[in-house]
Amino acid sequence: HSLSRRQRQMCIRDSTRLPYDPNLSKKLLAEAGYPDGFEITLDCPNNRYINDEAICVAAVGMFAKVGIKVNLDAQPKSIHFKDLQNGLSDFYMLGWGVPTFDSHYVYSFLLKSDGSWNKVGFKSDRVDELVGTMLTETNLEQRNANIAEAWAIVQDNMPYLPLHHQVISWATKSNVDVPIRTNNEPV
């Protein structure tokens, strides 16, 4: 699941998608000391998201284009998420839905220094401070400014690599009524 500001309450500035540029990627890898790329394992669930393993297979091919050899380890979600929570993965697929449609939900779990799902180790004292204001600031204009500042810091640091936004479509016949919650699950 992408960390897209477009879907959240606080859409302040447009999100800029990074360009697809394999040559720039190779150049940056060389500058970082990896002129010949490197090898890493991508941990991926194979029964949690729609086409999760297929998405990871596609990512493996994309990384290969810039010289990064990715070994795919696709496992059932019961193993995958347990390994993530125990800090046993350095590179992994993680989806994140936001049933509240508010930035605080994303930040408190994924981007706050002590967030329970901040497994990438992202740390920013300023972001932590801004996350605190998301709970207490009652002036909506100021709250949105704080959120925009936090998103700018995160975008500049890129602790996560957003791949896609999973959209689930539901359809029924006119004689069937199935209420759907914001987390895409039927009631």
What are these regions (language model features)?
Residues 1, 30, 82:
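Short, flexible, glycine/charge-rich loop motifs used to bind or transfer phosphoryl groups or to couple energy/partner
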Residues 1, 7-15:
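Conserved small/polar residues in nucleotide/adenosyl-binding loops
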Residues 6-9, 26, 50-60, 65, ...:
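Detector for C-terminal structural segments
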Residues 17-21:
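Alpha-helical scaffold elements lining the catalytic groove of polysaccharide deacetylases
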Residues 22-41:
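Immediate post-signal peptide segment of exported/extracytoplasmic ligand-binding proteins
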Residues 33-35, 64-70:
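Secondary-structure transition/capping motifs at alpha-helix termini
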Residues 37-47, 70-73, 90:
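Short, well-ordered beta-strand elements
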